Amino acid sequence: FFLWGISAYMQSRTGNVSDKLVIYNWGDYIDPDLLTKFTKETGIKVQYETFDSNEAMYTKIKQGGTTYDIAVPSDYTIDKMVKEDLLVKLDKSKIKGFDQIGSSFKGLSFDPHNDYSIPYFWGTVGIVYNTKLVKKVPQHWDDLWSPDYKNQIMLVDGAREVLGFSLNSLGYSLNTKNMTELRLAETKLNSLTPNIKAIVGDEMKGYMVQGDAAIGVTFSGEASEMLDKNEDLRYVVPSEGSNLWFDNLVIPKTVKHEKEAYAFINFMLKPENAAQNAEYIGYATPNQAAKALLPKSITDDKAFYPSELTIKNLEVYNNLGQKWLGIYNDI
């Protein structure tokens, strides 16, 4: 983990002296300068730890023995954690700036009243490609199966993302529980093997920027960072459908510094901070006041702030339950 900031005294919800906040977040998913700023403004030191999958984060919190005050799970994982009583119900009277969150990002199926979560970032899963290394611009998932891309495709390390684009290519739902559909998607995915160069995490950014692969299946924010570093890269969301995801701030029941957790949520809801974070990370912000502060070159880019028409073809992951999640992972 990493420590940012300086020490100071703060009163915790129990009245004991506290100067600490423990955050559990995805890697490379906040501007470090904001953590420094938070500490300078509040005197609260941040202990920052990272995870690389929702499943890893969920398992660690579920097993107990941790003291995370803030975590950043995705949509379907929030639903699961709420049902398993792993999250604190938020006191809205302690939250300032929630009204700045766009209506499209509130009241979603995984937390219908936002009783447990505050929108942080949102985005899509799509195809990043190198214009100098592809003969034809990929527009559809089926394009990945072209023999032109033998040993030229990087896949994000996520079972639902990888199986998901195979399901989408066949016209099936990302949340299907139909075993026939899943087996057909598995068979089709297996036929992609000759084209797969590697299944990777954050390392994909370096490989794509360096031109080590022609195509990558990844998240929109990761693609944004790649595009900033290599002018030959482009990003597309296939028109037949893909994943629309949401990552939210939550307070796990492992919380030891609840007052500090609310202070952090309010800090991140400030438009100037949310805008700075969005520009640094490259993901789309649900904070409309923050979006207004961003350059139009960012907010007008339909690859990263897609149109309503595109969004209608996208699906949010449902919480499949342990049995079906296991089946997806096994495939």
Regions found by a protein language model. Give the residues of each.
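Early extracytoplasmic/lumenal segment of secretory-pathway proteins
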Residues: L3-M81
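A ligand-binding cleft/hinge motif common to bilobed small-molecule-binding domains
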Residues: T77-K80, V209-Q210, I215-D232
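Short, hydrophobic alpha-helical packing/hinge segments within bilobed ligand-binding/sensory domains
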Residues: M57-Y58, I78, W141, M204-Y207, ...
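Conserved C-terminal helix/tail region of periplasmic/extracytoplasmic solute-binding proteins
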Residues: E308-I331
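Periplasmic-binding protein-like
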Residues: G123, L182-S191, K229-K253
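Extracytoplasmic ligand-binding site segments that recognize negatively charged/polar headgroups
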Residues: T67, V72-D212
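Mature extracytoplasmic/periplasmic domains
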Residues: N243, P252-I311
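General small-molecule cofactor/ligand-binding pocket signal
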Residues: Y24, Q47-E49, K197-I199, R234-V236
